[in-house]
Amino acid sequence: MNKIKRLFINKKKNILNIYFTAGYPSIDSMPLILKRLQNLNIDIVEIGIPYSDPLADGNIIQKSNTKSLKNGMNISVLFYKLKKVKKYINIPIILMGYYNQFIKYGEIKFLEDCIESGVSGLILPDLPPRIYLNKYKKIFKKSKLAFIVLITPQTSLKRLKRLSSITDYFLYIVSSNSTTGTKNNINLSFLERIKEINVPKLIGFGICDKKSLNIAFKYAEGAIIGSAFIKAIKKSYLEKSIEKFIKYIIK
């Protein structure tokens, strides 16, 4: 069974998904980050594939992408490192990247490497749902990889219902029209509007402290924290900075 599916069967609320950029703060950081987050009982880990032009991301994640690329991280290195820690990591791993990266690497090879690396799902925010349905859905289903869809405050009710039927296991709710890392800009009227959608939801963008985390937990099954986590982790004392942030956010 897909690990994301199993998680949502066994846990119905207060799900915490932590995002970080592969190859940041150093090219060798990822295994330690994964192990530490697992030991701290984080539910899902989302790993960003570094990209030179991350459209939806704010300053913090953009800088982590730049640093990661300078460190030598790329998709091949990412899969290599994930394969090395696969037997130690039991929590679901989701990769987040861009459609161009997916195509350039080779779609079939990308999905095969996901399976071999223990990845449970993919987020490709700029992959049009129509293209996914026509070209990739059968491949995803065959590989048992989840395809996660994002919705924003600008998503119409009609489109929202359609996307709810496409996504696997949960919807990624973008809490505002801002880029990632924007503090205290959560669109509460939007969260009220999607509250009754009968699909599990995780809220991201702007979840940075206990207050915003509690808002996410109120309106959805869980939250996604990215920029705040990346800002908090330090190369020189990586393990301690991870533990300090997680304990702060869930205290």
From Swiss-Prot:
Pathway: Amino-acid biosynthesis; L-tryptophan biosynthesis; L-tryptophan from chorismate: step 5/5. It catalyses: (1S,2R)-1-C-(indol-3-yl)glycerol 3-phosphate + L-serine = D-glyceraldehyde 3-phosphate + L-tryptophan + H2O. The active site is at residues 46, 57. Disulfide bonds: none annotated. Gene3D superfamilies: Aldolase class I. InterPro entries: Aldolase_TIM, RibuloseP-bd_barrel, Trp_synthase_alpha_AS, Trp_synthase_suA. It is an enzyme of class 4 (lyase). The alpha subunit is responsible for the aldol cleavage of indoleglycerol phosphate to indole and glyceraldehyde 3-phosphate. NCBIfam families: trpA. Belongs to the TrpA family. PANTHER family: TRYPTOPHAN SYNTHASE ALPHA CHAIN, CHLOROPLASTIC, TRYPTOPHAN SYNTHASE, ALPHA CHAIN. This is Tryptophan synthase alpha chain. It comes from Karelsulcia muelleri (strain GWSS).
